[in-house]
């Protein structure tokens, strides 16, 4: 039975209605006979709001404490989406930084993944659950939460998919593909159907923010194929390999 890792970006789960749509995509994969692991970002612009909140107490320089604040956005998303899934009759359990098995260095606010132990994720899959993983976070050697920097939920999805040897790693984004230009500015712009890792590097370096650059390097190292998709249609927009 193949494993699909589905990562939902913040704008694709910005409210409960969008979470219900995300849950139908999970159900679609389960109906096709796949095991599913879900990775979530914080809802909408929650991370920015938390940073702004920290700024009101001049706290942005305290990176350890920022991590303790910011990781809550993804935890909130994971808990709510799990509630939606369970409400639909899907066996699901949310996880957290202490049990997802992502071990990092101690560079708070921009930690690097050092090791992934997916045994707890595999255990839930074997028990018939959909693990719902809060992205963007890991745990250092002192048992403290760390965050992986901007776009870190993409990193979470890619390292988990690589460790599980997933059949698919699908990143659901509000734009649904990689485009030659910003589709929000130019609605007639064409998309890339397929890109190599190197081509995507170059596009990201020119300012594209659809995929986290560090996640591309990890995918390339593990020969992991990444798909960018639209959650409304479940149509794959761009494949990166």
Regions found by a protein language model. Give the residues of each.
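Nucleotide/pyrophosphate-binding catalytic subdomain
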Residues: 1-220
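Terminal amphipathic helices with adjacent charged low-complexity linkers/tails
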Residues: 41-47, 233-240
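Conserved glycine-bearing catalytic or ligand-binding loops at nucleotide- and phosphate-handling centers
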Residues: 218, 222-236
């Amino acid at each position: 039975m193949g494993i699909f890792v589905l990562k939902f970006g913040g704008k694709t789960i910005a409210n409960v209605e969008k979470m219900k749509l995300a849950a139908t995509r999970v159900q679609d994969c389960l109906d096709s006979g796949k095991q599913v692991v879900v990775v979530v970002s914080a809802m909408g612009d929650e991370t920015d709001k938390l940073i702004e909140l920290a700024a009101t107490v001049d706290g942005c320089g305290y990176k350890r404490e920022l991590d303790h604040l910011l990781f809550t956005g993804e935890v909130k998303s994971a808990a709510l989406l799990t509630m939606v899934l369970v409400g639909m009759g899907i066996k699901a359990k949310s996880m957290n930084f202490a049990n997802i098995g992502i071990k990092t260095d101690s560079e708070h606010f921009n930690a690097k993944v050092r090791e992934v132990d997916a045994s707890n994720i595999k255990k839930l899959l074997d028990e018939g659950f959909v693990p719902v993983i809060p992205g963007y976070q890991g745990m250092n050697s002192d048992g403290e939460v760390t965050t992986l920097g901007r776009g870190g939920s993409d990193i979470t999805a890619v390292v988990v998919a690589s460790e599980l040897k997933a059949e698919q790693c699908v990143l659901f984004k509000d734009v649904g593909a990689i485009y030659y230009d910003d589709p929000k500015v130019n609605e007639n712009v064409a998309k890339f159907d397929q890109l190599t890792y190197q081509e995507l590097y170059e596009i990201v370096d020119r300012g594209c923010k659809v995929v986290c650059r560090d996640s591309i390097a990890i995918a390339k190292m593990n020969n992991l194929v990444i798909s960018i998709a639209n959650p409304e249609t479940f149509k794959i927009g761009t494949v990166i390999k």
